[in-house]
Swiss-Prot record:
This is Indole-3-glycerol phosphate synthase. The keyword Lyase applies. Pathway: Amino-acid biosynthesis; L-tryptophan biosynthesis; L-tryptophan from chorismate: step 4/5. It comes from Prochlorococcus marinus subsp. pastoris (strain CCMP1986 / NIES-2087 / MED4). Keywords: Amino-acid biosynthesis, Aromatic amino acid biosynthesis, Decarboxylase, Lyase, Tryptophan biosynthesis. HAMAP family: IGPS_B (MF_00134_B). Its EC number is 4.1.1.48. The gene is trpC. The keyword Disulfide bond does not apply. Belongs to the TrpC family. PANTHER family: INDOLE-3-GLYCEROL-PHOSPHATE SYNTHASE (PTHR22854:SF2), TRYPTOPHAN BIOSYNTHESIS PROTEIN (PTHR22854).
């Protein structure tokens, strides 16, 4: 999947006239591209409020990050659970009206989740870094900042807001970007979950030899449709490679019942990221128990 960055000049001036016309490449081709293009604007706005230098100054006051990777690896529940806090999505709109992030985080911890993922994108998912900060005060579990990260600034902001891990999406980042952003996270002692959707993206990640936590996204980020067969296809071809190189595979999205979990367990998946399935339930703890007690 090729995701373009926004053209530097989104309009073209018409000769001898007092107006400009849109550049032919100035319109996003899909939802993911639209999200990524908006991130440039969002980051500029963040920097107007808090500079990168000021963010970095706040790092010394923080406690060391919790070990997200080890929490999944040594989870009592198999596969380990990254339980997600998400109010809305571009494809489904508002998922949870009664949205109380701190209460949700407490429910996840009581239920046995290994880690918690927090959506911080505001425009498309109605998340925020303030929500991440609130969740940090409500749980001792490692936290993943779930955003569309394209800049070092976002990593520092995530860390200052309480994140222990970040998500990097292969589809929106070049190899150089992936390597650079991973290095920053490593320097901050944060875990990195790198996300792929197909074999081509996975081959890129494996060639970098830098990632030990790989998320297989069952959701096509161009269409936002989910298909659990994505994980099955990738694991059928790469499970031996994952084992050989001590890579922990995570299956993300589209996991709806205990049969799905049994299938993923049987093919070597070590962790699952589940959000919408829990967000639609009035009783999250009971839903969690029903889902995992039968596997």
């Amino acid at each position: 999947m090729e995701i373009r960055r926004r053209p530097p000049n989104p309009t073209v001036r018409v000769e001898n006239l007092e107006y400009a016309v849109p550049h032919r490449e100035a319109k996003a081709k899909n939802i993911l591209e639209e999200i990524v293009w908006y991130k440039d604007t969002e980051i500029k706005n963040f920097k107007k409020i808090v500079s990168l230098e000021d963010l970095i100054k706040k790092l010394d006051k923080l406690s060391p990050p919790k070990d997200f990777f080890q929490s999944i690896l040594h989870s009592k529940i198999k596969p380990g659970v990254i339980a997600e806090i998400k109010k809305a999505s571009p494809s489904k709109g508002v998922i949870r009206e009664d949205f109380k992030p701190k209460e949700i985080a407490s429910c996840y911890e009581k239920s046995g989740a290994s880690c918690i993922s927090v959506l911080t994108d505001k425009r498309f998912f109605q998340g925020s870094y303030e929500i991440l900060q609130d969740v940090r005060t409500a749980t001792n579990l490692p936290l993943l900042c779930k955003d569309f990260i394209i800049s070092a600034y976002q990593i520092y902001k995530a860390r200052v807001s309480g994140a222990d891990a970040i998500l990097l999406i292969a589809a929106i980042l070049s190899d150089d970007d992936l390597f650079y952003l991973k290095k920053i996270a490593d320097n901050l002692k944060m875990s990195v979950l790198v996300e792929v959707h197909d074999g081509q993206e996975l081959e890129r990640i494996l060639s970098l030899k830098s990632f030990n936590l790989i998320g297989i996204n069952n959701r096509n980020l161009k269409t936002f449709k989910t298909d659990l067969k994505t994980s099955i296809r990738i694991m059928s071809k790469y499970s031996d490679i994952f084992s050989k190189h001590n890579i922990v595979p995570i299956s993300e999205s589209g996991i709806n019942n205990s049969d799905d979990l049994k299938t993923l367990n049987s093919i070597g998946i070590k962790g699952v990221l589940i959000g919408e399935r829990f967000m639609r339930e009035s009783d999250i703890e009971n839903s969690f128990k029903k889902l995992f007690n039968s596997i």
